[in-house]
């Protein structure tokens, strides 16, 4: 999974650099979101500018970030 992460004082910007957010990528994305949450990141901006397709597992990963 390709992404960039920019941490600011009050938030982080997670830029997903993949065309598809599907069952191959979703578990890795969930893990990253959980890791960031455990590190104390409370506000996350998810930049999906390059993503062209999201399946149900991708949507589930996004919802993980909202918890």
Language-model features: locations:
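Amphipathic alpha-helical interaction surfaces in cytosolic regulatory modules
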Residues: 20-67
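Flexible glycine-/small-residue-rich
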Residues: 16-18
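Short beta-strand/loop segment at the start of cytosolic alpha/beta domains
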Residues: 1-14
